[in-house]
Amino acid sequence: MMKLTIRKKVLFCSLIPLLLLGGIILLIASTIVKGAIIDQVENSLKGTAIATQAAYDQNAGTYLQTENGDIWKGSYNISQSENLVDTIKQESGMEVTFFYGSQRIMTSAVDKNGDRILGSPAGDKVVEKVLNGGEGYFSDNVSMDGIIYYGYYVPVYQKGDNTTPIGMVFAGAEKQEISHSVIQIINTIVAIVLVVLVICI
């Protein structure tokens, strides 16, 4: 009976450091994994936004707004570029949007009725960073029709004038889908840590 009690005490004393070590490993691994995934998301969104901007920018001429409100790049009507944004979405899995100034002119994103989400303005922070500051901007809290996205914005300039942006291009991915992927990876890490702990015990 005495030997059994001592054995339990030894087991208990050895179990505490193992559990602490497992918890620390889990915390560090989860933080690293989440950070790495978010960095990858940002880089992917940035790449898609830049590629979309280049697709519009390859058309000769300047960006301008006609009397009926349509936005053109030379002889190319951006306000009717549904095929372009839908193709980019199909190939990349990301939503893309062209802003003229702060207004959403063309987008692949649709609302619950299947209508494109057009005319809504960008947020103040986006305007400050991209239109006023001329910077690329990554956000983890972009809302479109009640859905939260990770998003990246790049400024759009007239050809030969990099002083004042005339608009922006946005690329976004649903935050919930990415969070689900992160949770799946973390759950896998938890399972591995638990298996290792059981083996050690």
What name fits each language-model region?
Residues 1-4:
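Non-catalytic regulatory/interaction regions at protein termini and inter-domain linkers
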Residues 135-139, 146-157:
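A short beta-strand signature within small-molecule sensing/ligand-binding domains used
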Residues 6-32, 190-201:
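Extreme N-terminal signal-anchor transmembrane helix of membrane signaling/transducer proteins, especially
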Residues 173-193:
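Membrane-interface helix-start motif
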Residues 30-54, 184-188:
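Juxtamembrane membrane-water interface segments immediately C-terminal to a transmembrane helix
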Residues 43, 47-59, 84-106, 136:
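Short N-terminal helix-loop-first-beta-strand/juxtamembrane motif that initiates sensory/input modules
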Residues 48, 150-179:
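Short, hydrophobic beta-strand elements of compact beta-sandwich sensory domains
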Residues 79-93, 108-144:
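Extracytoplasmic/periplasmic sensor domains and loops in membrane signaling proteins
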